[in-house]
Amino acid sequence: MNGTQKAFFEEKERSLGVRLNDVQTQAVLQTNGPLLLLASPGSGKTTTIIMRIGYMIEALGVNPSRIKAVTFSKASAGDMKARFAKFFPHLPPVDFSTIHSLAFQVVRQTLERQGISYGIIEESDKPGVVSKKRVLREIYEQLNGSKITEDQLDELLTYITFIKNKMLPEQEWAIAEVKVPKKVEILQRYEEYKRTGSDRLLIDFDDMLLMANDIFTKNREVLAQYRRRYDYYLTDESQDTSPVQHALIAKLVAVHQNLCVVADEDQAIYSWRGAEPDYLLNFRKIYPEAQVLLMTQNYRSSATIVEPANIFIQRNKKRYNKQMFTENPAAEPISFKILENYNLQAKYIVDQLKNLSKRGSTAILYRNNTSAIPLMDAFDRAGLPFYMKDSTIRFFTHWVVEDIMNFMRLAYNTKNITIFEKVYRKMNAYITPTQMKALQNLPEDGCVFTQLLEHVELKDYQPEYIKRIRKTYDSIQFDKTTPTAMLEHIRFDFGYERTLKKMSETLGFNYENLLDIVDVLGLIARHTPTMTEFAGRLKQLENLARSSHMDNELNAITLTTLHSSKGLEFDRVYLIDLIEGILPSEVEEEIEEETRLFYVGITRAIRHLELISYSKRFKTSVVPSIFMKALKQIVSPQELPKKAPKSPKKALKQYRNERTITTESALIVGSKVKHVILGEGEILAVTSSTIELSFASGIKQFLTDTCLQQGYLETMED
């Protein structure tokens, strides 16, 4: 290290209290040529990035306007900008922006030069405004003859993003597995509408990336202009970027190759949006002169959390061989809690948190936003303040919630034909649209079921079903029947669960997810004696979710999805709903990404980490997450079960391949094997009941039956 470099680091340590480790220092000093900086959780990534940029300007004399830092989100760009201003207040600002912002600059400049009028189609979904969602809703209805649900619309939007970010040609649009009827035709019409359905060209955010890449490919003058604009590029969170984003950056740095890519393939969790972590694994093939640095020292978490997390992530094969470590001392042991039933989970968490004086650094993490609703209800009743990080929770406007409310509204007034029209298809009375239209032509002066029986032509089998439903509604007293009892009528007497099953089979919905919504409503119903109070409570919770997102008070508990938690840290972290089918999901092909998602969750914790599962979800038996079991076995390998646990076939298949050891005869003392969690090891001893293995982390003992039945061991490659 020369005098200038030494002076820079000494001054920053003195003025900022920032002292970099050897790898961080290398990353700061490596300014020319391609650099891949693989940053494990809590490794001081942002500090290193800011110090690197500051070093280039202060020590090397690089003009700040010649540096471009590209981030994953607007929030990240803002955070970087603020951090840079704090570290280097005397320096001019650097250009921190998202890749979409960079792409839009290129597109806007080109279209304006060509005199082409354009508009952005991503505006909010307001009446009278041409928006992406509104256009897609209309196209879906035209092609399918029915309205699109919010779930389907979300899937459709994700599908379009995936197609464009992957740069898939039209003949490959059908490849993506999305359960939206006529998805390809919808996308074709959507693209046509943007070109011809308005007095100007319409562009969405994904178009910006494709169009910018296309402009760079076809217009050498524009590409040369942007190449001259910046001498140094830095991309953050690059494990979350897609082929089209990589292509854009590759074109811009092709001449000077001064590219610093900051990423962690172990935290790649956005493949469903088109992200490709394989780009990181192939970085040296793309840039043969690249230097790869591993920032693996974790400054965030206790050794009690870091060491098991490091072992856990090594089960993945698509990764660099890096070992996360920490010099932090051990703290509280990781807690594993399996409750008797799902309906006890929210109360259990309230009991854990209600006596804490400082809750501001506590987070509850979950896979799906539906998991937040029982927590909101329980926290509000217990007077625990909370902050919803995710701004959009569609639970309260979900069509299943709306169905349930309409069944209840019909109980208030069985003469209401308008409400009946919304649910008649979903109560298994086999009423046809023609019969419904005939009912609508009658005056609203009698019970809809009586009107059907007396004034509408029915098939011979229909009166029996209609009379049965009428009898149930006659037994319901709106101001006395509890919402819990009403939900039982809806689910079973009206056959709503059967309806959900049929809809899932025909329209591609996830049946378990739909039932989860009904189950959550059941939890809320337990605390409301009347249907009127139940409806009021739902509205209250909806408003609470909205206001809690806007008001992040200092002592509030954070509720957030695992995806949204990336980049955050909390003193206390609780991962909930850890069961098979939720985490990991039921898609076997995505097991490595599911593993990474779990890894992201556990590495948010600083001192206290608790994993929570349950044996039953109401009356249905469920299986605790195999990830939870795996981590527990890492933490406490001596705590062997008395017999091999029963796991679903799905979980078994996730481990098995042609090298999986399934017979005791293949367990040979002295042979090298690979444990799916602990990695390479050597067999030291084998008995009929146990097997002893030596790993880099020490000697471990397992049940022989467990290893064989679960497929935990593999033979080593020759």
Protein language model annotation of sequence segments:
Residues 2-12, 16, 55, 243-339:
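Conserved RecA-like helicase ATPase core segment
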Residues 41-49, 289-291, 296-385, 412, ...:
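Helicase P-loop NTPase motor core
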Residues 102, 330-331, 356-481:
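ATPase/helicase motor core of nucleic-acid motors
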Residues 578-699, 704, 712-718:
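C-terminal accessory regions
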Residues 1-117, 224, 307-310:
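P-loop NTPase Walker
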Residues 8-9, 18-29, 33-41, 95, ...:
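Conserved helicase NTPase motor core
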Residues 97-105, 234-237, 262, 533-589, ...:
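Conserved helicase core region in the C-terminal RecA-like lobe
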Residues 455-564, 585, 608-612:
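Accessory C-terminal helicase-associated subdomains
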